[in-house]
Amino acid sequence: MPKWTPDQQTAIDDRGGALLVSAAAGSGKTAVLTERVLRRLTDEKDPVDIDRLLLVTFTNAAAAEMRERIGAALGAAVAANPRDTRLRRQLFLVHRAKITTVHALCLSLAREQAAVLGIAPDFRLMDENEGKLLRAEVLEEVLDTAYEQADEKFFALCDLLTAGRDDQKLGEVILGTYEKIQAHPDPRAFLEDVRAGLYTCGMDTPHGRVLREQARSAAQHGAAFLHMAVDELTGIDELADNYLPALTSDLNQAERLLDALFGGSWDDCVKAARSISFDRLKAARKFEDKAFLEQIKAMREEWKGVANNIREKWLTVTAEEAEYDRGLTAPALFALIDMVNAFDDAFTAAKRARNAADFNDLEHFAVRLLYTDGKPSALAKTMSEQFTEIAVDEYQDTNAVQDAIFRALSRDETNLFMVGDVKQSIYGFRLADPSIFLEKYRSFGEVADTADGQPRRVVLGQNFRSRAAVLDACNYLFAAVMGETVGDLVYTDKEALHLGADYYPESGNARYKTEVLLVDADGLGEDDDAPDKTELEARLAAKRIRALLDEGFPVTDKQTGKLRPVTPGDIVILLRSPRNKAPTYIAELERIGITASAEQRGGLLETAEVGTMVSLLSVIDNPRQDVDLIGVMRSPLFGFTEQELADIRLVDRRISYYDALLQSRTDFPKVETFLQRLDFLRTFACDQPVYRLLWEIYDQTGALGLYGALPNGAQRQSNLLTFFER
């Protein structure tokens, strides 16, 4: 049986109500969650059937892993207690356990309650490409209608965003606004709150507070550099008359600005920012340490850049000037809200006409079903009684819609078990809102200090995965960069990673340290034979790995717990874009005799070049498949631009894209060339096997040469040849 830490034991055993577990990287959170489930199933006083638990994970893969872990744990328990009928029953029920993603949960709920929602229960989910195309078509129709019915507010919006040019920016803003508000439980209500806020002025508004906070953070950053510069100059008599007066003046101005930002009115802040001036540094020709002078100048330049940014970006206008600007921009913003609502209506209608929905719809379907007038509905109360506990993993990556769903199903959080780590929130681009996790973290009390029934928190801060050298480096970095204004969390000892692994016999050995290897990519030039940045980084990484292997760098064997020389299989290279960069790293490693492989998520069919071939084969079979057809035309094989594709679509939006091509072939020579090649391939396919058709495609389009000329061309060519061989 594992030896649990006190905090892990609390997370496993606590039954006092809502519990938030802040689980640092490598803290054993999955093992803790699995053990908590097992303990609930086998509790002698209050056992729970597994189908009375709802376990929500972030991905399908995580849900499958959780089901497998729980099944394995139950299997081991049954093996140890073969006569325990209750355990055997739970093992039998594992396949019925509600271990799911939030979208799968919402999909199931929407299908069951389709009649209430007024939709068909057999609706389908659109994929990302179909959704993107449909949004573009709907947006175009909405803009056409808006131009036909334009009023002064709409023209004000156009003037603000288009400057008399094309309306691409207008469309981008409408779509961007629409997509962002989908993270709110009631997007329409949110927009109406924004509309109401436009009738008020003054900088004591959410927008004004954000501007002040941004300026405050920047001013603190710049002032810190001035403090360092003044400290460095103190005691150097040769520079007392040259540099110190100007820097002291800078520092005084920075502190006056900070005083205003922390305690003054808005106009006080603007006045302080506008009054900032920069005295000249007197030449110090006799001072010999020129590098030191450059360092001081760089610190001052940092402050000057910050001060200029504050004046130009955040503290740009007084309250009176802001009121004047509001009068000019409010009509445009009213029009933007109206346009977003119009797009929402049209997009919803288009999806319904196709009996389709997207992932945002699933979440909002659930909110509609689970809430009535802002309170949990009768359905929500009925469903909440089905679950003894709801456990949600990766809670830092939830948004407001998902949080509302979990609250409705958990009797307003009274039986909600949440696990996450705000430091690992990486899905802001998907509208995740880590502030939800932070608000709970700050408002929930420590378990030891909070009565049962009240929301509580426990921190799993010990890392059982890494050496002290790794953790110390991480803590050093994050303590420096994280704060209330960056990361929304002050990185104290409570949030830091603490050593939990006691199985490294080499712990404390000075040779185990964190290294930072820097590549100077400046001056690479434009020579075709010159290595690019990725190649240089790969070469340096390969060189360092070669050195580790040659010296027999000692590592701990996972099986024996003893030291042995490192092997290539012990080493992993983490890349932000492995699909594009991994081939370069593999080539550099193999060049110096190190065997390497890369795990390409999604496999061969997910690569851009092979995916294009699959789409082209599909189009040859049936050209009236808009998504595949447009994807092929945009690919390097045919090189149509987005503007060209849009012009073709404008021929007639009511027909398929292929039919639009047929109608426009005489007007666009590029379309005629494309259709001739497609017609040839369709004819060729009638009496030839697929492998010959594929090679004909390679030959007709020059695919191997085209993709070979792109970055990582050799790997792309290899992918195409592998696809052909299969």
Label for each model-derived stretch:
Residues 1-56, 60-68, 72, 129, ...:
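Conserved motor-region signature of P-loop NTPase helicases/translocases
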Residues 52, 168-357, 453-455, 539-540, ...:
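Conserved ATP-driven helicase/translocase motor core recognized via long
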Residues 651-681:
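Accessory alpha-helical DNA-binding modules that contact the DNA backbone or grooves
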